[in-house]
């Protein structure tokens, strides 16, 4: 994912479930990219998980992660603080947004420059108890336009249904 993000020219969209890796590495990983492009983050809504324990329990079982709602809550808190710090910095050239969604997560996705001919995405599908071994696909708009457009349309549904937390 990071290598793809490094190729971005104008913007990066990152869709994840718990976003734990990104939350741990945000200050190193995203700070450099924010010098060149804007970044948009989408993750599960931690409040929704806390208030919908059955749903959270299903996701806990699906991902094989104990206390999944708490795990998402901690990642969200960390990412929110990072976004606020970055956006409040008067020297920050590009902004970062953070939005949450409640739809069942089926994949994580990183999309760079979706409105250009050089657009590209990496899609990682979640399967039951998959751990770190997940099917991963790199899709270039120039080579497989229909597939790229189809998957990006799927992502746009999520973008439109999400709730902006940091604008």
Q: How should these model regions be labeled?
A:
Residues 35-37, 92-96, 119:
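Short glycine-/polar-rich loops that comprise or flank the Walker A/P-loop
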Residues 16, 43-45, 83, 102, ...:
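Generic secondary-structure microfeatures
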Residues 4-6, 33, 90, 101, ...:
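A generic structural signal for short, solvent-exposed coil/turn residues
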Residues 76-82, 105-110, 155-167:
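Short flexible/disordered coil segments
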Residues 1-59, 139-154:
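PLD-like (HKD) phosphodiesterase/transphosphatidyltransferase domain
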Residues 52-107:
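HKD-type phospholipase D/PLD-like phosphodiesterase module
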Residues 122-167:
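Signature of lipid phosphatidyltransferase scaffolds
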Residues 96-136:
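HKD (HxKxxxxD) catalytic microenvironment of the phospholipase D
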């Amino acid at each position: 994912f990071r290598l793809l993000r490094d190729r971005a020219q104008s913007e990066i969209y990152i869709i994840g479930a718990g976003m734990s890796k990104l939350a741990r590495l945000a200050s190193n990983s995203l700070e450099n990219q924010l010098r060149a492009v804007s970044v948009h983050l989408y993750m599960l809504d931690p409040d929704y998980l806390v208030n919908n324990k059955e749903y959270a329990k299903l996701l806990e079982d699906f991902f094989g992660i104990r206390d999944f709602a708490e795990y998402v809550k901690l990642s969200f808190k960390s990412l929110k603080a990072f976004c606020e710090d970055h956006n409040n910095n008067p020297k920050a050239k590009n902004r970062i947004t953070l939005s949450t969604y409640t739809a069942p997560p089926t994949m994580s996705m990183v999309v760079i420059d979706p409105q250009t001919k050089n657009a590209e995405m990496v899609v990682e599908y979640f399967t039951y108890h998959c751990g770190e071994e997940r099917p991963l696909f790199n899709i270039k708009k120039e080579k497989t336009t229909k597939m790229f457009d189809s998957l990006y349309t799927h992502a746009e549904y999520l973008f439109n249904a999400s709730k902006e937390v940091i604008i």
